[in-house]
């Protein structure tokens, strides 16, 4: 699809509490854990159990589609409540404590349907409209999620929720749809944007990675174009070494394999599903809090790569 001829003023997120956090809170001293969830309770569990971020999707049976505005709003509240509880437990000077100060990252997938990642003009416009509406929602909710603690009165307090977007779009020939991705990043207007595993379907991942850096994408979710992150470790390692957007390893990532994955790739961020076992095929795949806690414990103990 060619670059779309669409202009619109996106609401600014930069001066509100639901934004990308200031650099002081952006780089934890541990491997970052991002969960993948498809409901509000999954966001709440992830924040309560100590995960750093959650990707919020609908319809994970189709690899994730855009959740409703109502679901996103409720998820922001759920995450903010957990962060405020953590900060309240840390006391009035919580802003001086890294674990308490860190916002919870909520990444909303923007994907109008399952299937291929090649979109026509109508689908592209729908994706841009979704980013615009969610950005507007963030502004509306900013006052409701403003930090309550004083943090000692020094400097700007971190937000409770670091809201961002997960996008992905390809052309028919397996390259990044630069026109559409640029419009989506522009509409996010400063909020962090992740390019999802459509990346693994690119004909040339090195070229695609360079394109995404030029488009302002901050994170790339990838298995190294393999079935699992472990199988794609060499590709992931090459991307990490090139120093572009932050690489988030995904694809059958499990707590017991984190040490080997980090050592073989150099990644500092991982993405994993933590589903509860289902009794029937039709039962929704809820998030398993015990599994999230095991994953959190694992990422806190794995040494950071040099």
Segments and roles (model prediction):
Residues 47-54, 79, 102, 159-162, ...:
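Glycine-enriched alpha-helix->loop->beta-strand junction motifs that scaffold or abut catalytic
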Residues 22-25, 73-84, 95-100, 135, ...:
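Surface-exposed amphipathic alpha-helices with a cationic face
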Residues 68-86, 93-179:
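Glycine/small-residue-rich loop that forms an oxyanion/phosphate-binding "nest" at active or ligand-binding sites
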Residues 38-45, 116-136, 203-215, 239-243, ...:
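Catalytic cores of alpha/beta
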Residues 40-41, 60-82, 122, 171-187, ...:
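Active-site-adjacent beta->alpha loops and helix N-cap segments on the catalytic face
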């Amino acid at each position: 699809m060619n670059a779309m001829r669409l202009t619109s003023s996106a609401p600014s997120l930069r001066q509100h509490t639901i934004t990308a956090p200031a650099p002081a809170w952006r780089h934890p001293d541990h491997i970052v854990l991002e969960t993948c969830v498809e409901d509000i309770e999954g966001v709440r569990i992830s924040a309560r159990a100590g995960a750093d971020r959650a990707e919020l999707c609908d319809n994970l049976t189709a690899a994730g589609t855009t959740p409703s505005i109502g679901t996103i709003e409720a998820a922001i509240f759920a995450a903010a409540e957990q962060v405020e509880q953590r900060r309240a437990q840390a006391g009035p000077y919580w802003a001086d404590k890294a674990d308490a100060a860190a916002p919870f990252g909520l990444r909303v997938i923007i994907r109008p349907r399952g299937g291929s990642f090649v979109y026509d003009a109508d689908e592209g416009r729908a994706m841009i409209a979704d980013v615009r509406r969610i950005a507007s929602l963030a502004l509306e909710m900013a006052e409701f999620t403003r930090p309550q603690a004083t943090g000692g009165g020094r400097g700007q307090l971190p937000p409770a929720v670091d809201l961002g977007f997960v996008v992905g779009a390809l052309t028919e020939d397996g390259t990044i749809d630069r026109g559409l991705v640029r419009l989506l990043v522009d509409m996010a207007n400063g909020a962090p944007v992740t390019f999802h595993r459509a990346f693994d379907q690119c004909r040339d991942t090195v070229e695609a990675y360079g394109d995404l850096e030029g488009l302002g994408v901050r994170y790339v979710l990838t298995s190294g174009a393999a079935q699992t992150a472990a199988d794609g470790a060499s590709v992931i390692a090459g991307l990490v070494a090139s120093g572009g957007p932050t690489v988030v390893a995904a694809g059958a990532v499990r707590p017991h394999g984190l040490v080997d994955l980090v050592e073989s790739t150099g990644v500092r961020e991982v993405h994993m599903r933590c589903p509860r076992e289902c009794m029937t095929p039709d039962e929704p795949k809820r998030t398993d809090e015990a599994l999230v806690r095991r994953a959190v414990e694992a990422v806190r103990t794995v040494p950071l790569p040099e």
